[in-house]
C-alpha cells in the first residue's frame, strides 16, 4: 500500500520542483476515513445484567490517526496522507458500544466514561490495526482485538476474555479499500463477540 502511495507522492514532489519557486503552493490534502462496521444481529436471549464499556486501549504503533503499513516483519511505516477522522480508540469504542446495544446481549449498556455502576465491565485491547504489505502480491488488512469482562464489585482479574483476529485480503491497493476492509472486519469481530457473550450466561 505504501509503495503505491509513495509513487503518487514522488510524482507530486517532481511536479512541485518543476513549478519553480512559486510562493503559493497548495498544501497536501489528507484523506480521512471512519471505521463504520455493519450493524450486529440481535441474539436470541438477553441477559438481565448490565454492562459498561470500560477502556479501549490501542497498541502504541497504531494509536495515532495516520494509517499504518507493515512493510516487513519489523518495519512499520505511517501514511501521512491517509488517516482516520479521529484516533482509532474512540472510533472502536463507539463501535463496540453500538454493537452491544444492537445485539441486545445485556438488559442495559452503559456508555464509556460513566461511573462503573454496572454488573460487568468490558475492556478491549487492540493489538493490530494495519495494512500488511509484506507480500505485495497479497496485501491485506490486519485487525486483532482482545476483550476482557470483569465484575467491578469483585476480583480484579477478568471473569472472561477472548482474542479475536481477522485478516482481509485487499482486492485493490488503496486507502479506501483498506478502510472498508477494516470496517468489515470490525463488524465481523463484534458479531462474534456478541454471540460469545450471550453464550456465557454470566451469573449475578
Language model regions located:
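Surface-exposed short loop/turn segments
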Residues: 22-44, 103-155
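A structural "domain/chain start" motif
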Residues: 22-89, 199-204
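Envelope-exposed proteins and targeting segments
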Residues: 47-54, 63-65, 72, 80, ...
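Short secondary-structure boundary motifs at beta->alpha junctions and helix caps
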Residues: 75-83, 153-195
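Extracytoplasmic/secreted envelope proteins and their assembly/folding machinery
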Residues: 89, 93-97, 103, 183-186, ...
Amino acid at each position: 500500500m505504501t509503495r503505491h502511495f509513495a509513487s503518487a507522492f514522488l510524482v507530486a514532489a517532481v511536479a512541485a520542483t518543476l513549478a519553480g519557486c512559486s510562493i503559493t503552493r497548495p498544501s497536501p490534502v489528507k484523506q480521512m476515513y471512519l471505521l463504520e462496521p455493519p450493524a450486529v444481529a440481535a441474539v436470541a436471549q438477553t441477559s438481565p445484567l448490565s454492562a459498561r464499556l470500560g477502556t479501549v486501549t490501542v497498541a502504541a504503533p497504531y494509536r495515532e490517526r495516520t494509517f499504518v503499513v507493515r512493510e516487513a516483519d519489523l518495519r512499520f511505516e505511517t501514511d501521512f496522507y491517509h488517516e482516520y477522522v479521529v484516533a482509532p480508540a474512540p472510533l472502536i469504542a463507539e463501535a463496540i458500544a453500538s454493537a452491544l446495544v444492537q445485539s441486545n446481549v445485556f438488559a442495559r449498556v452503559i456508555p464509556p466514561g460513566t461511573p462503573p455502576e454496572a454488573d460487568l465491565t468490558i475492556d478491549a485491547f487492540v493489538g493490530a490495526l494495519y495494512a500488511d504489505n509484506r507480500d505485495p502480491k497479497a496485501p491485506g488488512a490486519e485487525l486483532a482485538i482482545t476483550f476482557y469482562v470483569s465484575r467491578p464489585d469483585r476480583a480484579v482479574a477478568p471473569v472472561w476474555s477472548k482474542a479475536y483476529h481477522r485478516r482481509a485480503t485487499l482486492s485493490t491497493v488503496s486507502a479506501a479499500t483498506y478502510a472498508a476492509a477494516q470496517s468489515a472486519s470490525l463488524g465481523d469481530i463484534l458479531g462474534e463477540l456478541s454471540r460469545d457473550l450471550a453464550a456465557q450466561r454470566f451469573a449475578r
